[in-house]
Amino acid sequence: IYTLSLHDALPISDIYFAHGTGYKSNGKNFVNYFGRIYQARYLSGIVAGMNTKTNKLGYVAAMDSSNSEVTGGIDAFALGVYSVKPEAKIYVKVTNSWFDPDAEKAAAQTLLNMDCDVVAQHCDTEYPQTMAQEKGVYGIGYNSDMSKNAPDACLCSVIWNWGAYYTAAVQSVIDGTWDGSNYYGGMNENLVGITSLADFCTDGTQEAVDTAKEDILSGKNGVFDGVIETNTGETVGEEGKTLDDATITGGINWYFKTVEVVE
């Protein structure tokens, strides 16, 4: 459908097409849009780090390190955790599927059996949250406010606000300012964020999140800043610089030093 849409858009100059999470565009009336979800992942890592007692945090991941979107999210989460709890470890269990309820259940159970007391996720079902609640520990949801699924466990959820892009895109067509460029918004555009924190978060969590959010919004914190050590002992990045967008979206195939993949 994606390829056909791009092909069919070419001769229809008065209709505008936008594809979420895509990569193809014609620079005219077919564009793609995505967002800096890693910014919200970083904030959620702060929440997780502030609330762990075992210093073991789990992460159910849809894809392995070959997928930069998933891996970048894990690393951003880990960097957020590290900023408040450098001794904590993040254990990742990969399902190799964007949607597999059974695999997501099994992955969450593996992490809970390892005494992870906060379980985050980049997968579609709410099972990591509901299973965390059943065990009496915490979770970090994704895509929607999962506190409705696990009100006693979900510390917060990482969410998208796609309406921010849709409003801007439609307005640009109305105004005649549509320029055919791709879109990559973030917290400054209100495209990504985290939900309100649970009232059972430990003292100081909100303050830590607020400070980090201010730094991200101001540009002081780019999340992937400076020299970053991977879990294989190598380093990426340069002192005084932030990884560029091309690297963030397509070149993060490594894990931060506090991350361990569970086989």
What do these predicted regions represent?
Residues 1-8:
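Single conserved hydrophobic/aromatic residue that forms the stacking wall/gate
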Residues 91-102:
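Short beta->alpha junction loops
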Residues 134-204:
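Extracellular/periplasmic periplasmic-binding protein-like sensory domains
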Residues 33-55, 158-178:
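Hydrophobic alpha-helical segments within soluble ligand-binding/sensing domains
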Residues 176-263:
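Segments of small-molecule ligand-sensing domains
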Residues 5, 20, 114-125, 140-142:
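Periplasmic-binding protein-like
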Residues 11-35, 144-152:
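Flexible loop/hinge segments that line or gate small-molecule binding clefts
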